[in-house]
């Protein structure tokens, strides 16, 4: 693994490696030691006591953050007829049918989220090999396969983030930007924690949140006490 740069090392020195911080302390510290030359993203990482290999311990969904993410999401909606008109009225960036299947197959990715009505999933399904590895495939669990395209587009534009447990049992989620007020970041952090607590699989045994940390785009991780949320 490549050695981190001097700015990273300087930031790391400001973190007490033996301390577990409260959510408020961790967010304040992450903001303070961030050294990016742009408005970096603040991210939280949960290490959960689940076995993702088991179907009954999969965790996936989406949550609307009360203070948004600080990023404007570009939304592509696969819909036709009245649903296409609804998507356009809701502020979708792109709305269409098979023409977008062709564009994506040719390497076009000027969007962040795809929403599709159920009747369009036959078309979207053709893109499985392209969209799947990028995490862009619409899914009913995240509210992106739906007839209510207005609600879906509005929520994404308002600051909806998707979460999914990875093979190691980790869930990562962006909770805003370094420029956000610390209190707003903490409120978003608590919202993500609350939804993950509600999503705890019945089959999960032992400690649910094993480790928790806050970081910025290039910054080091800061350990957080789950009880502080």
From Swiss-Prot:
Molecular-function GO terms, alphabetical: rRNA binding; structural constituent of ribosome; tRNA binding
GO CC aspect terms: large ribosomal subunit
Pfam families from the UniProt entry: Ribosomal_L1
Keyword annotations: Repressor, Ribonucleoprotein, Ribosomal protein, RNA-binding, rRNA-binding, Translation regulation, tRNA-binding
Keyword RNA-binding: yes
Source organism superkingdom: Bacteria
An example Gene Ontology biological process: translation
Keyword Cell inner membrane attached: no
InterPro entries: Ribosom_uL1_bac-type, Ribosomal_uL1, Ribosomal_uL1-like, Ribosomal_uL1/biogenesis, Ribosomal_uL1_3-a/b-sand, Ribosomal_uL1_CS
Record note on quaternary structure: Part of the 50S ribosomal subunit.
Similarity remark: Belongs to the universal ribosomal protein uL1 family.
Biological function: Binds directly to 23S rRNA. The L1 stalk is quite mobile in the ribosome, and is involved in E site tRNA release. Protein L1 is also a translational repressor protein, it controls the translation of the L11 operon by binding to its mRNA.
Protein name listed in UniProt: Large ribosomal subunit protein uL1
């Amino acid at each position: 693994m490549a050695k981190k740069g001097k700015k990273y090392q300087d930031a790391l020195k400001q973190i007490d490696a033996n301390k577990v911080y409260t959510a408020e302390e961790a967010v304040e510290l992450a903001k303070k030691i961030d050294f990016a030359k742009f408005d970096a993203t603040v991210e939280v990482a949960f290490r959960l006591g689940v076995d993702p290999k088991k179907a009954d311990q999969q965790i996936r969904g989406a949550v609307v953050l009360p203070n948004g993410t600080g990023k404007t999401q570009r939304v592509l909606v696969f819909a036709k007829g009245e649903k296409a008109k609804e998507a356009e009225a809701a502020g979708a960036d792109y709305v269409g049918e098979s023409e977008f299947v062709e564009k994506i197959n040719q390497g076009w990715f000027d969007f962040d989220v795809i929403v599709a009505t159920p009747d369009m999933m036959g078309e979207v399904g053709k893109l499985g090999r392209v969209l799947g590895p990028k995490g862009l495939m619409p899914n009913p669990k995240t509210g992106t396969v739906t007839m209510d395209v207005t609600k879906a587009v509005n929520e994404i534009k308002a600051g909806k983030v998707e979460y999914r447990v990875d093979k190691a049992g980790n869930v990562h989620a962006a909770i805003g930007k370094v420029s956000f007020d610390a209190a707003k970041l903490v409120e978003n952090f608590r919202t993500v924690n609350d939804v993950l607590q509600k999503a705890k699989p019945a089959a999960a045994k032992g400690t649910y949140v094993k480790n928790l940390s806050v970081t910025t785009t290039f910054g080091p991780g800061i350990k957080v006490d789950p009880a502080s949320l």
